[in-house]
Regions:
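Acidic, divalent-metal-binding catalytic cores of TOPRIM
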Residues: 1-150
Length: 150
């Protein structure tokens, strides 16, 4: 039985987020760049450094994905690893995907440390959210909230 059918049978609305954790939805490079208070000509360099930072999490993402496959499917370790390698090859291709896959809570802690060291700034979740402009929120978040209200 799928999770959606089980939820429907129990009169529940189910939404499975596309990103790993809710915190991943505030990992928007443009917003983070504005919070760094750098001049616009430094944006490309900021993106490069941000991607280098998130790339340090690639092995953790691989391990978590393989562990998830092993937990919920009855396959052997080598098959789970092969599937994970393919998934990572397909998905770990750009900064947007990487920021969706990394553990958001853990990466936010790392990001805050990076901001302290590099920019002498503390970075909080509320600061990040406050920096968002209306059109920068992911459509998925907007649609889920709209569905909950209506």
């Amino acid at each position: 039985m799928t999770k959606y059918k089980e939820a429907h049978d129990n009169y529940l609305d189910l939404h499975i987020w596309k990103r790993k954790e809710l915190e991943n939805y505030i990992l928007e490079p443009q917003v983070l760049f504005r919070l760094s208070q750098q001049s616009n000509d430094k944006y490309e360099h900021f993106l490069k450094e941000l991607e280098e930072l998130v790339d340090t999490y690639e092995d953790r993402v691989f391990d978590q994905y393989a562990e998830h496959i092993l937990k919920y499917r009855k396959i052997d370790v080598s098959t789970a690893n092969a599937e994970t390698r393919k998934y990572m090859k397909d998905m770990w291709t750009n900064l947007e995907n990487k920021l969706a896959l990394v553990g958001g809570k853990e990466f936010l802690r790392c990001l805050n440390n990076w901001f302290k060291q590099k920019f002498s700034l503390n970075l909080s979740i509320s600061q990040i959210i406050s920096e968002f402009q209306k059109d920068e929120f992911d459509n998925e978040i907007v649609e889920v909230i709209r569905d909950m209200i209506l």
